Amino acid sequence: MPISIAEAILQGANKLRKAGVPEARREAGSLLAFLLDKDRTFILSHADDPISEEQETLFQEFLDSRALGEPAQYITGRQDFYGLEFEVTPAVLIPRPETELLIEAAIKLVGTEEKVSFCDVGTGSGCIAITLLTQFPQAHAIAIDVSTEALGIAKRNAARHRVTDRIEFVLSDCFASVPQQTFDLIVSNPPYVAEDAVATLQREVRDFEPRVALTAGADGLDVIRRLVTDAQRYLQHNAHLLFEIGFDQHEAVGNLVDAQVWELLDIHQDLQGIPRTVALRRR
């Protein structure tokens, strides 16, 4: 006998709760809404509607994956970022709300100058570069990643948001394979987790997100060191370098900055008051 939407969510929430998944009811409802291709308003207003046996079976598969710790974003293959929807797979980091600070900081730095060229280092899903291109219709970007699989996802997201003609994708370890040129802005959400901190991460992050996009050496600063050193060759004078950092890294990052090369403009905090984004200007 078919079960109703409400019954499916209740059973799903109980299963996820037993598996230690936070906000189990919300997650169960979101997974069912995705499966039914409906929004949460529909789910709430049609709680007594039945779901088919096929839908129930698929929903149970979703729940099984989520109960094992797989992020919902990988199960559904999508994540919202700055009002846009992006395809995500285990080949790319899941875009986070705190990374939207990079977008806001970049918009503030660029101001009214729309004809900008910028580089996104470690583009992953492409969410940063693509979002900035939608904000600046005359901008052009180069998006770099060390992962072929990640670049494939980013290319599909660029096509989805119709910016393919304004973005070039480069397979490169930082700037190693990037032809010499200068940009108005370099932006990055680099890996910054210390190797010995991996065990402390949530299982959704630790066991499912790509390690290459998370960790960067013993102190988590290996990639940021390269970024601060190498970016100066790719920036015009008075151009900007903008990147995300870990919650406890602002002092260490400040010590990496050569004052003869860079002016430290700001370290932006997130809504919890945690330093998240560093803004530098090339002298």
Residue ranges, per PLM feature:
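Non-catalytic accessory regions of SAM-dependent methyltransferases
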Residues: 1-44, 51
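Conserved hydrophobic residues forming the short capping helix/wall of the S-adenosyl-L-methionine
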Residues: 16, 110, 158, 231, ...
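Residue-level signal for inorganic ion chemistry
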Residues: 31, 69, 99, 128, ...
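Conserved AdoMet
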Residues: 32-108
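Conserved SAM/SAH cofactor-binding pocket of Class I
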Residues: 97-200
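Helix-to-beta-strand junctions that scaffold the AdoMet/dcAdoMet cofactor pocket
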Residues: 163, 209, 235-237
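Mobile active-site "lid"/loop adjacent to the S-adenosyl-L-methionine
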Residues: 192-223
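Conserved Class I SAM-dependent methyltransferase catalytic core
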Residues: 218-280
